[in-house]
Amino acid sequence: MANVVVIGAQWGDEGKGKITDLLSRSADVVVRYQGGVNAGHTIVVKDKVLKLHLIPSGILYPDTICLIGSGTVIDPKIMLSELDMLVENQIDISRLQLASTAHVTMPYHRLLDQAMEQRRGNNRIGTTGRGIGPTYSDKSERIGIRVIDILNEDKLRTRLADPLRQKNNILEKIYAISPLDFEEIIKEYIEYGNRLAPHVVDCTRVIHQAARARKNILFEGAQGTLLDLDHGTYPYVTSSHPVSGGACIGAGVGPTLIDRVIGVAKAYTTRVGEGPFPTELEGSLNDHLCSRGKEFGTTTGRRRRCGWFDGVIGRYAVDVNGLDCLAITKLDVLDELEEIKVCVAYELNNERIDYFTSNVEDFSKCKPIFETLPGWQSSTSDCRSLEELPEKAMMYLKFLAELMEVPIAIVSIGPNRDQTIIVEDPIHGPKRALLAA
């Protein structure tokens, strides 16, 4: 039995969906512990591309229970559309369970998110505009609406009255936006609640029962380490905790329940939205990575910013999350390059530093110090073992393992399930006995 957390080791979009999908084969329960529809993951199964935002990747396995935990925020309209899409693809959704204590994104959250971002002008954060930040803000202010509230009309009326009055006041007086109708919201969200009711459970209790029965539990994070509210490039961050510690809070478990933490990182780096990005590329190289890697957001469709692999933020992710091993994705995107650079340190104020600075003003001044490695200039997409990889591709992976000071357990060389090299079973294999330098 092993309980595993999967996290993003960069700024999100690392390919966690594919890795979680693969690991879900060994999991009895998969738990999404934070975030909302601001995160998306793409899974390719038998030439079908499934784009999910809220539903855990494990839903594709017929014997896996999928939980959406208390640390998430739910947009019921989008969640129901995803469930409908899964049903259309003959996927059983009866195994999906939703925490009664998860908070719900309301119409005013989306309006406020978009209005506040527009008002920031040149200081915008790069929010998806899906209402995630305002939903978490109401949760902290203890005026939020939870899933359990939309299951009962009388309760929803009581819970919604004061918050809607406040939000309409802000929308009208500050942003000149027409107020929202109380009765329309009640009608809409009670309908959502009626449809979601069969899936609503005491999520924490379900997890504890699974743990006592010695089931394999997989905790699935959204976004990435550098987007964490406390440990990321604040204020250019999300409103929740994608780091491994967030799994304990968002799922309601103690840290001793976690056996392993697996970090997912691309073989290069990407970022969506605003904020400093030391290894960011421009021109033809940026275009090449974006085109080859299909670097457009699942949620917003925005083009991702692309850059070389950053070992400094990588080591930071190892430390913050307590990573046991890595999954390196999109190695194949680098196949055609003559040479590949890796950031091993920064230059800040004419001094070399090898650590991530949480001061965003200083971080924005950091200049990458690179080491250059030879490219392999041959296809890796058909490789199914380390021995089949080009020698220079192996050199690159070993360099990353040494730089990050953790072993590599999985290498992904394409979007399909079978385009994966399992170096060692990251769940049941020997700890820290995988691909290292």
Curated annotation (Swiss-Prot):
Highest taxon, organism lineage: Eukaryota
Cystine residue pairs: none
Binding-site list for Mg(2+): 13, 40
Record carries keyword Chaperone: no
Cofactor descriptive note: Binds 1 Mg(2+) ion per subunit.
Keyword match tRNA processing: no
Xref: SMART domains: Adenylsucc_synt (SM00788)
Residues noted as binding GTP in the record, renumbered to the chain: 12-18, 40-42, 304, 330-332
Assembly and interaction partners: Homodimer.
Assigned protein family: Belongs to the adenylosuccinate synthetase family.
Protein name per its UniProtKB record: Adenylosuccinate synthetase, organellar chromatophore
Species for this entry: Paulinella chromatophora
